[in-house]
Every structure is written in C-alpha cells, then in structure tokens.
A protein has these predicted regions:
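Short cytoplasmic-facing helical segments at TM-TM junctions of multi-pass membrane proteins
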Residues: 145-186, 210
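Transmembrane alpha-helices
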Residues: 132-136, 168-200, 227-228, 232-233, ...
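Periplasmic/extracellular loop-to-transmembrane helix junction in inner-membrane transport proteins
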Residues: 3-7, 33-77
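Transmembrane-helix boundary motif in ABC transporter permease subunits
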Residues: 74-104
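C-terminal transmembrane helix and the adjacent membrane-cytosol boundary/short C-terminal tail
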Residues: 94, 151, 181, 228-269
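N-terminal signal-anchor/first transmembrane alpha helix
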Residues: 1-32
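Generic hydrophobic transmembrane alpha-helix motif, especially the helices
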Residues: 105-141, 148-149
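Glycine-rich helix-loop "coupling/hinge" segments at transmembrane-helix boundaries
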Residues: 121, 196-233, 252-262
Length: 269
C-alpha cells in the first residue's frame, strides 16, 4: 500500500499517466456507443479523429493555432510590462502596496467573462479588443505573483546590499533578480490562463484562431469538429507549457536541483 508522499519512480509515473488516459478514452468509447448520450453531446472518438484530420488539411489548423498563440503572446508581453515593474514596486514599498492592492485584489475574483460586453463597447471588436481582454484576464494574476515573490526576498540580502552602499535603484534591481526565477515559473500558469480566455475572445468577430474555428463548427452543429478543436487547444497549450518548462530549466537550473522531490500531479516535468 502506498504511504503518504511516497516517491514514485519515473516508469511508474509514465504507466499511471498512460493508464489514466486509457481509462478516459475507454470510458469515452463506451459512453458514445452505449447511446446513453446523444451524438452531439458526446460524438464517437473515431469521428473526432477524422475531424481532427479535416481540421489539419482543410481548415488550416496550424495557422489558427498560431493566431491564437500570437494573441496570447501579445497579451502576455503587455501583462508583463505592466505587472512586473508595478509588482516590484508594490513588493518593495508597503505604502504603495496598501494604496493599490484594495483596488486590484477584488479584480482577481471577478468573472472576466462579465467584462466582455464592456470591452466590446469600449474597444470595438477588432484585434485590440481581443488582446486587451486577454491582458485584463492575465495581468492581475501576474501582479499578485510578482508581489508575492518580491516579498519573499531574504531581508538579509537587502541588509547586505545596504551595507555595501547600494542605493534604492540598485536594491530594486537586486530584488528583481532575486524574485524573477519565481516569477518566471508562474509564466506557465499565465499561458494556461491565456489559452482559457482566448477562446472566448475569438468567438467575437474573429476570422482566425482556434476559438473561431470551434464557434464556426458549433454553428453548423459539427460537434466532432468542436471536440477536435478542444483537443487541439489542449495539445497546443501542453506544448507551449513544456517549452516554457524547458526554458526555465535552462535559465534557472538550480531551481530544479533544490525543488522538492514530491511534485503536485499537475506540475510540469
């Protein structure tokens, strides 16, 4: 019997992952052929695979995935440009934190979907609205992470800097360098958030993107193509998350060395 926090070897982790997906796909096959659910609610997996092939050959799946990624990338850059310096200052100066936090803290709990009509009214329905909507969904999360990571900087490190004659700009730079590895680690989740919201943004007056592709399939009741689009989102998001994980391991190898042996089930390997 497994004990609490008992380490699991790499072969066992792989086997458990394969078993989990086999269980999901097997259940999907069974339910779709049992007629317990209508075909539009749960189409046949083989039909979804064929639809995936059609998306690739006939509907420019790769181009649509790239367009969705490009929108997320733009929102990511704008979010970082706002949240990283502001979060650094909030983490460094408590007075600024207590001035801004009462405004931004409630925004993290609000459903972003409720703001979509407001963004359409303010910015129209072009690319600016879509990117702005994604920034709104990402920036408050990143801001909280930056503030938290800056607050974790060891006070002894700051005292050493002061002793060596560092001024405020040098100390802020030191705090940024000390906190950035943790901030970079949050970029994976930030991209996941972007993939979650980009679909909603692309359902409004879009001509490209995975969200547009799914919405177009839904309008003609092609639910096999809808499910194929959903799977495409999952695959694309996983690949980008994996690339960010590789980048983190290359930039900050010491974080992997000192990380705890027990990882959460959803932690990137």
């Amino acid at each position: 019997m497994a004990t609490i926090r008992q380490p699991v070897s790499q072969p066992v982790r792989v086997a458990l992952g394969v078993a989990a997906w086999a269980l999901i796909i097997g259940t999907w096959f069974a339910l779709s052929h049992s007629k317990l659910l209508p075909p539009f609610a749960l189409p046949d997996p083989l039909g979804v695979i064929k639809a995936f092939g059609a998306l690739w050959t006939e509907y420019n799946l790769l181009g649509n995935v790239f367009m969705s990624w490009w929108r997320i990338a733009q929102a990511f850059i704008w979010s970082a440009l706002v949240a990283v310096p502001l979060g650094l200052l909030m983490g460094a100066f408590p007075a600024l934190f207590h001035f801004i936090n009462p405004v931004v803290a409630p925004m993290r709990s609000m459903p972003i979907t409720a703001f979509l009509p407001a963004f359409m009214a303010l910015f129209g329905m072009d690319e600016g609205m879509k990117v702005g909507f994604l920034v709104f969904g990402m920036v408050f999360y990143l801001l909280a992470v930056v503030v938290e990571e800056v607050s974790k900087v060891d006070e002894a490190l700051l005292e050493t800097a002061y002793t060596l004659g560092a001024g405020t700009p040098q100390t802020l730079w030191l705090m940024f360098r000390a906190s950035f590895p943790g901030v970079f680690g949050s970029f994976r989740i930030l991209y996941d958030i972007g993939w979650t919201y980009v679909i909603l943004a692309e359902m409004v007056n879009a001509r490209k993107g995975v969200g547009y592709m799914i919405e177009a399939a839904r309008k003609v009741l092609d639910f096999e193509r809808v499910y194929a689009g959903i799977i495409a989102i999952g695959v694309a998001a996983f690949l980008f998350r994996w690339l960010l994980t590789l980048a983190e391991h290359q930039l900050f190898p010491w974080r992997r060395a000192v990380a705890p042996q027990i990882r959460t089930p959803f932690a990137a390997k």
